[in-house]
């Protein structure tokens, strides 16, 4: 079909981003939804969601890589190589091509394994590859939702700040009356704004950390499954090599 399993990740994160854009900018709704033109509205939604999904995934992936580099001192290649080595050391590969690739570049060896699994005509191998592909989709979904979470936190701050500001001013006046001193309104608004921003940042940070952790788990599982599947179908079971 026109869309495959990998495109679903873009549509999911893109739909979330599209919904947030409509929430943040209500006038954008008229551009997306066209009265009495259902087919056109659906087509526009799919296209916009797909594009937004790609943008969200790229931004989320780069942010995850930056976090890993900043706090774990690991690049994306370092992370892949580490998982690759931890898994591959449990097997003895005999194929000359893959052993040479593993010695030269773990990332190239991984890509080669992925390609062989993808091109296999074995039904068992194809079923396993579909299963492995789901982890790529899940990872892309988690990474693609990072940007919407950031956008949502900013939107909530801007749209809900007047409410928090009024509550904050009332609280400051109450504290001032209770303690017998007065806080200037400007400083009160700054204090409430910083407190509100801190609360939203902490909540958003928790969700983003969860998304990054789940994305990393998907990468680990995907790399392990690719190596195990390749070894089983191309090293351990020679019958599958004859039909690829």
Locate the predicted segments by residue.
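Transmembrane alpha-helical segments and their cytosolic interface motifs
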Residues: 1-12, 119-166, 192-197
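Juxtamembrane/interface segments at transmembrane-helix termini
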Residues: 55-74, 160-166, 208-225
